[in-house]
């Protein structure tokens, strides 16, 4: 494969976009949510577990910044940190997600405690952050290109959730509305880095594997939630109904 001619930028972008067939919008858990078939517990479980992803995204982006010697890239990439953590004196995406939690009936302190985060979700998110720390900054930046498909998933929630789940406070949808514009902006930057960096066929094939790795992470998170909230088989379900799994080990 490494001896093959490289794809043109247009062909490479098309190959990247084709990976959208495996985006987690197609996972049965997501399909149930936007078709109105999810229970209150399933939506709350998704919000609680996804919060762990939200609070780790700034750490992923900080790792990219730490590994990146390109000042101009850093100047633009740092906006992602501000989007989630918030600028001084301002709320960011993390606070918006906490408000989403309140909107679906979760206590913010319980969300912050991460006591509801399933081990499978924690392992998947931790793998993503660890990849960003160890990979080259270009590879870590390119792994964010699941954002190519993100506007569609945010819009699907805005279109369907108010109709199917009137018990959710509409104020909680702020995060999805905000991310619509942010994700489109981030895609432009991430795609430009990717198309510029991967100019050999071997490099392009590696990038497609990296994007698949990120897709695997998102899909695996939902697999863990399906086990817990759809099949009623959370960790250790055969021996206890208690949430005995670890709540995060600080090193």
Curated annotation (Swiss-Prot):
Report the Pfam families cross-referenced here: TENA_THI-4 (PF03070)
The protein's annotated catalytic reaction(s) are:
6-(2-amino-2-carboxyethyl)-7,8-dioxo-1,2,3,4,7,8-hexahydroquinoline-2,4-dicarboxylate + 3 O2 = pyrroloquinoline quinone + 2 H2O2 + 2 H2O + H(+)
Annotated pathway? Cofactor biosynthesis; pyrroloquinoline quinone biosynthesis
Enzyme category, top tier: oxidoreductase
Q: Which GO terms describe its molecular function?
A: pyrroloquinoline-quinone synthase activity
One Gene Ontology term from the biological process aspect of the record: sulfur compound metabolic process
Physiological role: Ring cyclization and eight-electron oxidation of 3a-(2-amino-2-carboxyethyl)-4,5-dioxo-4,5,6,7,8,9-hexahydroquinoline-7,9-dicarboxylic-acid to PQQ.
The Swiss-Prot or TrEMBL record describes its family as follows: Belongs to the PqqC family.
HAMAP family with a match to the protein in the record: PQQ_syn_PqqC
Q: Which PANTHER family match?
A: 4-AMINOBENZOATE SYNTHASE, PQQC-LIKE PROTEIN
Instruction: Write down what this protein is called.
Output: Pyrroloquinoline-quinone synthase
Q: Which organism is it from?
A: Pseudomonas putida (strain ATCC 47054 / DSM 6125 / CFBP 8728 / NCIMB 11950 / KT2440)
